[in-house]
Amino acid sequence: MKTFDKEAALELLDKDEELLSILIDSFLNETKFEKTVLEKLIAQGKTKEAASYVHATKGAARQLCMEKLQSSGQALEDVLRGKSGGDIPSLIEKMFSDYEEALLEIQKA
């Protein structure tokens, strides 16, 4: 599973390098995934809002073919929405780790 698959992302965008650059810029500057925000929502019992917060980051990751972040985000979202079981704290750690890795990788693109 790849952190960022630039070629696959370009395929999805019909090889539009300019659009990919815009999406990367948006991910770096507008898509902020903060672990503390997510943990606060969960602590307040706002699991629906927490799932939506995760979903937004996961969706951005999907557009950019960030397979690891997309996968960990989907796993966490599924647990938050009650679709599957799992350890929420460890899933948060995994998603946050994948997010940080994706940030580093995409900055090289």
Please provide the spans of the model-predicted regions.
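DHp/HisKA histidine-phosphotransfer helix
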Residues: 46, 53, 91
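An anion-binding catalytic pocket shared by soluble metabolic enzymes
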Residues: 57
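Amphipathic, coiled-coil-like alpha-helical segments
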Residues: 1-7, 20-23, 27-29, 34, ...
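Short helix-adjacent coil turns
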Residues: 15, 38, 42-49, 64, ...
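Short, charged, low-complexity loops and linkers
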Residues: 9-21, 52
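A local structural micro-motif
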Residues: 49-50, 69
